[in-house]
Amino acid sequence: MDSNTVSSFQVDCFLWHVRKRFADQELGDAPFLDRLRRDQKSLRGRGSTLGLDIETATRAGKQIVERILEEESDEALKMTIASVPASRYLTDMTLEEMSRDWFMLMPKQKVAGSLCIRMDQAIMDKNIILKANFSVIFDRLETLILLRAFTEEGAIVGEISPLPSLPGHTDEDVKNAIGVLIGGLEWNDNTVRVSETLQRFTWRSSNEDGRPPLPPKQKRKMARTIESEV
């Protein structure tokens, strides 16, 4: 196993522990708590994949961080912070919408890269909107936290979420996953639109009808994908 992979996991475990202590003092805002919960799932998945104990890794990560801080001068810290571009956290969904449990009458699941796509194939003839919480850097989607499909009545009928055991995805991965979800929902004559915020930072454009600018070739490919899996 690569030593950098292990040490990266150890540091991530310790930093999560620090953030958890911060949250326990009721100091974290909603985006902070949301990332904390999802990072916990990711760490559990990575720990299982790597065969490493999280508690042991946390202690090792603490030693690594303490060693770095001992060598770090205040001036170097200021320069590092100034040179790192800041990302923004954007929310289409409330914390309640993100944390709400939902159930599928006819569940369908597909894995696309490091993203998991879930939808309820029992949903027909509905108007559906896709809403997401994600981070943005350089005016482009950086990391998808969670995307969910809602009916006009507020029911959740679909979802795209990162796989805890496979961290890391690009905006192109998110575009493709959204296309698969749209194709699956439209197969049952549902009308799907994407939130303006998600359109703007994923495709850098927005349409009044809420349709992302998918090229015809990609639309046909996604339709065939859904048809072959139904």
UniProtKB/Swiss-Prot annotation:
Q: Classify the source by domain of life.
A: Viruses
- Which Gene Ontology molecular-function terms are recorded? protein serine/threonine kinase inhibitor activity; RNA binding
Residues covered by region (PABPN1-binding): 223-230
Can you list the disulfide-bonded cysteine pairs? none
Q: Where is this motif: Nuclear export signal?
A: 137-146
Question: Which Gene Ontology BP terms does the record give?
Answer: symbiont-mediated suppression of host cytoplasmic pattern recognition receptor signaling pathway via inhibition of RIG-I activity; symbiont-mediated suppression of host gene expression; symbiont-mediated suppression of host mRNA processing; symbiont-mediated suppression of host PKR/eIFalpha signaling; symbiont-mediated suppression of host type I interferon-mediated signaling pathway
A UniProt-annotated Pfam family: Flu_NS1
Q: What is known of its domains?
A: The dsRNA-binding region is required for suppression of RNA silencing.
Q: How does it assemble?
A: Homodimer. Interacts with host TRIM25 (via coiled coil); this interaction specifically inhibits TRIM25 multimerization and TRIM25-mediated RIGI CARD ubiquitination. Interacts with human EIF2AK2/PKR, CPSF4, IVNS1ABP and PABPN1.
Concerning its family, UniProt says:
Belongs to the influenza A viruses NS1 family.
Under which name does UniProt file this protein? Non-structural protein 1
